[in-house]
């Protein structure tokens, strides 16, 4: 009996040990799924973050102004990239130190936000972010209240934006548009004039795209086309990973006014596209469930170039937009109102065009195959509807449709002697085009950073609730001097001297022409900046840098140490020669 009890106890211990081993093993397996974290606090955290901000900003700021330098960026494949575009430089920088990288990533966020909103001004935003955060760190280290500093910064930015809006003037002439484009293209007059011509051809609200040219020279080509303000439904449809766009050459275009959910509804049109060896674009109210899955699987596994886009607009406006698209591409709208559906449509109901480019936000259809006479008749119907309409909203929508149907698309073809040169010029043309659109939208202010410099003088009058908020205002006041300082320094002149001389006089149009090395009337000379670009750069920079100033701890992953590779085994015996 004793032996039986001992045997049972032994088995229980073994079972317990086995269970404990399994529990420890499961805990180890669970912990392996989570990386260890490192936490930095207070001054140390902000100092490390500041180092990342400063190093990134120093790399970006060398591109600023007419005498700014190029930056050469190593790429994982192909030749190095040469650029003067601030956001391109910022995006390329990664630090080994995780905390430094947090600071750099937040500056990249500023540059990206400014680029997305205004299309230009990324270098200015980066320089301002560094200036505000540097002063903010010093103030917090000296014992200032971080939240009061942030309130002061916010008050100062609001006051400066109001001042800039009062300083702005609208532009309208082709010459003024060319001046804005020239400044944003780093003084290349040819690019400014090319953009002005493109806007003249398709209107200020028209669609202008940028493409690689086939010659040494820049060219302007106007192609009849239409832009839809809807992008691809799924990123799986992307065909160009570099531009994050789906590009389809000579596609079949299916236009449907209802949702597409059934797999069988898209199989027929996919087979048709495969048979004709052509890409496929589907424009419908929506594509979801089985239908969307079928399209994605055929794109990924069968290699069929396909893309689905939601139809633009709502209700009757959507139907009208689809009808416009059908006439432009020579197809028909497959609608149940006329007894048609996706199971019984005929091949002649599909439209086509020369090229379709789909981004996450919009779709550009170039050179539709529709009958010219039908397109002109449709445009005339819209013009008549505009004349007869009494609603401002309806008129606006009708004018949008008319512009899309008959305005066309201007293509700026950028030429050069090498791929690197074309890439660098395309970066500058993109900045110039975005800046020009921003200038037309909100107006212009004197360029070269002087608008911000003169706005800083107005902050002397700003009333604050306490001393710490006053310091926040002074941080912005000092930061607003950095764009002029940086542009002058890049031109080989003492920046502090230029800033001091400009602040001494009262003419708010006077500035420093870094290209010629003289003080001039910036507006008369054509050195101007779009208000939207300057405003967005300041607001984004102040927002992120003031948040960084209030940071008290940073949590980052501790990099895993890779185990060394095992040594190679010995050779087989008898293999010596």
UniProtKB/Swiss-Prot annotation:
One GO location term (cellular component): mitochondrial matrix
MF GO annotations: ATP binding; ATP-dependent protein folding chaperone; ATPase binding
Localization terms from the record: Mitochondrion
Gene3D superfamilies noted in UniProt: GroEL, GroEL-like equatorial domain, TCP-1-like chaperonin intermediate domain
BP GO annotations: protein folding; protein refolding
Keywords attached to this entry: ATP-binding, Chaperone, Mitochondrion, Nucleotide-binding, Stress response, Transit peptide
Induction: By heat shock.
Domain of life: Eukaryota
Family that this chain belongs to: Belongs to the chaperonin (HSP60) family.
Main function: Implicated in mitochondrial protein import and macromolecular assembly. May facilitate the correct folding of imported proteins. May also prevent misfolding and promote the refolding and proper assembly of unfolded polypeptides generated under stress conditions in the mitochondrial matrix.
NCBIfam families with a match to the protein in the record: GroEL (TIGR02348), PRK00013.1 (NF000592), PRK12849.1 (NF009487), PRK12850.1 (NF009488), PRK12851.1 (NF009489)
Name of this chain's protein: Chaperonin CPN60-1, mitochondrial
């Amino acid at each position: 009996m004793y032996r039986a009890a001992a045997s049972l106890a032994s088995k229980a211990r073994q079972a317990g040990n086995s269970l404990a081993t399994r529990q420890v093993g499961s805990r180890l397996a669970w912990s392996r799924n989570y990386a260890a974290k490192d936490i930095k606090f207070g001054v140390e955290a902000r100092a490390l973050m500041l180092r990342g901000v400063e190093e990134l900003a120093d790399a970006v700021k060398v591109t600023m102004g007419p005498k700014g330098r190029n930056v050469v960026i190593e790429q994982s494949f192909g030749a190095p990239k040469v650029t003067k575009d601030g956001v391109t430089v910022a995006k390329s920088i990664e630090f080994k130190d995780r905390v430094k990288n947090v600071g750099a990533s937040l500056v990249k966020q500023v540059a990206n936000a400014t680029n997305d909103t205004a299309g230009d001004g990324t270098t200015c935003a980066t320089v301002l972010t560094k200036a505000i955060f540097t002063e903010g760190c010093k103030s917090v280290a000296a014992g200032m209240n971080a939240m009061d500093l942030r309130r002061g910064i916010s008050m100062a930015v609001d006051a400066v934006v109001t001042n800039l809006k009062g300083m702005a003037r609208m532009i309208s002439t082709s010459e003024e548009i060319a001046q804005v484009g020239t400044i944003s293209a780093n003084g290349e007059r040819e690019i400014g004039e090319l953009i002005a011509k493109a806007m003249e051809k398709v209107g200020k609200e028209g669609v202008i795209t940028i493409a690689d040219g086939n010659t040494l020279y820049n060219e302007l080509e106007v192609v009849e086309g239409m832009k839809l303000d809807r992008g691809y439904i799924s990123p799986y449809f992307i065909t160009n990973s570099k531009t994050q766009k789906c590009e389809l050459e000579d596609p079949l275009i299916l236009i449907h006014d209802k949702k597409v959910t059934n797999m069988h509804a898209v199989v027929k049109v996919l087979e048709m596209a495969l048979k004709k060896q052509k890409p496929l674009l589907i424009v419908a109210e929506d594509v979801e469930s089985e239908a969307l899955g079928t399209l994605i699987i055929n794109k990924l596994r069968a290699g069929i170039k396909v893309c689905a886009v939601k139809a633009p607009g709502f209700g009757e406006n959507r139907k009208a937009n689809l009808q416009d698209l059908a006439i432009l591409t020579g197809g028909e709208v497959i609608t149940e109102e006329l007894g048609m559906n996706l199971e019984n449509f005929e091949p002649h109901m599909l439209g086509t065009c020369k090229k379709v480019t789909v981004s996450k936000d919009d779709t550009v259809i170039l050179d539709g195959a529709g009958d010219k006479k039908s397109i002109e008749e449709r445009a005339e119907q819209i013009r008549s509807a505009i004349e007869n309409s009494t609603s401002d909203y309806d008129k606006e929508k009708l004018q949008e449709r008319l512009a899309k149907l008959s305005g066309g698309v201007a293509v700026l073809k950028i030429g050069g002697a090498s791929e690197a040169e074309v890439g660098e010029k395309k970066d500058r043309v993109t900045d110039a085009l975005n800046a020009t659109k921003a200038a037309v939208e909100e107006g212009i202010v004197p360029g070269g950073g002087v608008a911000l410099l003169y706005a800083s003088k107005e902050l002397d009058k700003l009333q604050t609730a306490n001393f710490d908020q006053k310091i926040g205002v002074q941080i912005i006041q000092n930061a607003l001097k950095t764009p002029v300082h940086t542009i002058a320094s890049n031109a080989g002149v003492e920046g502090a001297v230029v800033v001091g001389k400009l602040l001494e006089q009262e003419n708010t149009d006077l500035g420093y022409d870094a290209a010629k090395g003289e003080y001039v009337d910036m507006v008369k000379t054509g050195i101007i900046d779009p208000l939207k670009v300057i405003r967005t750069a300041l607001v984004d920079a102040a927002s992120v840098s003031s948040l960084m100033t209030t940071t008290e701890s940073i949590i980052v992953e501790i990099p895993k140490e890779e185990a060394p590779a095992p040594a190679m085994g010995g050779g087989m015996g008898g293999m010596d020669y």
